[in-house]
C-alpha cells in the first residue's frame, strides 16, 4: 500500500538533517535560483515535492471512501507522533518530568495499548456484524486475545518493554490496521460497536478516535520532551512538517489497488539525490 522506497528515502533525509544545528542549516546550498537560505531551503523543497505528490496522486485514483479518508487522518496523527520521537535516546525516554507524571516511554505504552484496544473493538464488531451474530455485550477476554493475535503475557511484555521495541512493533502494526480497515464499506460505518462505555458507538466513531487519541497524547509527549530538556530543534521542527507532507501523500495511497507509481518514484529519486548532495556538503 505505502511505497517503501518513498518512505525510506524521506526517513534517510530526516536522519541526515536531524542532528544539524542552525549554523549547519545556513551552510551554502543552492536550488535553481534560490541561493541565500542554505541547507535549510532543502527542507522546503522537499516539503513542496511531497505536497505536490499528494495532489498528483489524488488525480490518479478513485475518490477516497469515507473509511479511507478517516484512516488518512489517523495516519497523519501517527506520523506526527513518530516525527516527535526522532532522535530520542532510550535514557531520555525513561525520564520522568515530575513526580507522578509519565515518561515518554510510559505515554507511548499507553498509546500503543489503546491502539491495539481500538483495533480489537473494530475487528470484533466487523466480524460479528458480517457473520450476522452481533450482540451488544462486550467481547470475552478469550476473543480479545484471539483478535489481537497475542497472549496477555506477550501484550504485557510488549507494552512494558523499551520504547524502541514498541516503535518497531507499531511500524508493522499500523499499516496492517490501515490496510484492513480501508475495506470497510460506507454502510458498515454506522453499525454499533462495544467497548467499555455504555453507549454503543458506531464503527465510524471508533475510527475517528484513533486520530483524536493520538493527538491528545502526542501533545502530552511534546510537553514532556520540553520538561526534560529535549525541546525540538529547528531541524526537528522542519522534519515534522516533512513527515506531515509524507503522511498526506501516503494517505492518497490508502485503498488504491492500482496506481501509477511514476510520480512516487520520481519524488523519491529527487529526495534521494538531494540527500546525497547534502551529505557531500557536510563531509
Predicted segments — roles?
Residues 1-7, 11, 26-71, 94-148, ...:
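Short, contiguous alpha-helical
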Residues 10-13, 74, 78-81, 122, ...:
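Hydrophobic alpha-helical core bundles mediating ligand binding, dimerization, or RNAP-core interactions
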Residues 2-6, 154-172:
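A short, structured beta-strand-centered segment in the mid-to-C-terminal lobe
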Residues 16, 84, 114, 118-121, ...:
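Short alpha-helical functional segments enriched in proximate histidine and acidic residues
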Residues 58, 149-158:
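A short small-residue
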